[in-house]
């Protein structure tokens, strides 16, 4: 789910969010972005 993406998809310092994006999409969201090194899913 959405919260597990935050734990699983740590974001690199310079905005590498491929894992975050994939995790969020699998959880049924439109994608994800990185904020403060954490993955945030778009609704």
UniProtKB/Swiss-Prot annotation:
- Cellular location(s): Secreted
Entry keyword Disulfide bond: yes
- InterPro entries documented for this protein: Ergtoxin, Scorpion_toxin-like_sf
Q: Which Pfam families match?
A: Toxin_17 (PF08086)
Q: Which GO terms describe its cellular component?
A: extracellular region
According to UniProt, the tissues expressing it are described as: Expressed by the venom gland.
Q: List GO molecular-function terms, semicolon-separated.
A: potassium channel inhibitor activity; toxin activity
Keywords associated with the record:
Disulfide bond, Ion channel impairing toxin, Knottin, Neurotoxin, Potassium channel impairing toxin, Secreted, Toxin, Voltage-gated potassium channel impairing toxin
Q: List the disulfide bonds.
A: 5-23, 11-34, 20-39, 24-41
Question: PROSITE patterns, alphabetically?
Answer: ERGTX (PS60026)
Summarize the protein's role.
Blocks Kv11/ERG potassium channels.
Q: According to its UniProt record, which protein family does this protein belong to? A: Belongs to the ergtoxin family. Gamma-KTx 3 subfamily.
Q: What is known of its domains?
A: The presence of a 'disulfide through disulfide knot' structurally defines this protein as a knottin. Has the CSalpha/beta fold, which comprises one or two short alpha helices connected to anti-parallel beta-sheets stabilized by three or four disulfide bonds.
Question: Which protein are we looking at?
Answer: Potassium channel toxin gamma-KTx 3.2
Organism in which the protein naturally occurs: Centruroides elegans (Bark scorpion)
The top of its lineage is: Eukaryota, Metazoa, Ecdysozoa, Arthropoda, Chelicerata
């Amino acid at each position: 789910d959405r919260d597990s993406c935050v734990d699983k998809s740590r974001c690199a310092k310079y905005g590498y969010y491929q894992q975050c994006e994939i995790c969020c999409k699998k959880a049924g969201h439109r994608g994800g972005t990185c904020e403060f090194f954490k993955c945030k899913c778009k609704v």
